[in-house]
Curated annotation (Swiss-Prot):
GO cellular component terms listed in the entry, alphabetical order: extracellular region
Pfam families hit by this protein: Toxin_12
Domain notes per entry: The presence of a 'disulfide through disulfide knot' structurally defines this protein as a knottin.
UniProt xrefs under InterPro entries: Huwentoxin-1
Main location per the UniProt record: secreted
GO MF, any single term: toxin activity
Name recorded for this polypeptide: U21-theraphotoxin-Cg1a 2
Biological source species: Chilobrachys guangxiensis
Tissue: Expressed by the venom gland.
Protein's job: Probable ion channel inhibitor.
Length: 84
């Protein structure tokens, strides 16, 4: 039941977006710009270091107390150290 409600809300949201684009008199749908803005939202933020399970190439890419696990794909994992 919850899934069907979520799907219905998603469909209504998409219909609203396309309807509002038509009402503005736009010949082009704004979906590419809209999709690009959504992509920015879902991208991980650029940080000085990678958090747990983040992609890495070397140990210095990972945050403190994390090391680069070189199993494919490479990811940051706990290096078994503790402290401040």
């Amino acid at each position: 039941m919850k899934v069907s409600v979520l799907i219905t809300l998603a469909v209504l949201g998409v219909m609203f977006l396309f309807t509002s684009a038509e009402e503005r008199g736009s010949d082009q749908m704004d979906s590419p710009a809209w999709l690009k803005s959504m992509e920015i939202i879902f991208q991980s933020e650029e940080r000085e270091c990678r958090w747990l399970f983040g992609g890495c190439e070397k140990d210095s890419d990972c945050c403190e107390h994390l090391g680069c696990r070189r199993a494919k794909p490479s990811w940051c994992g706990w290096d078994f150290t503790v402290g401040k």
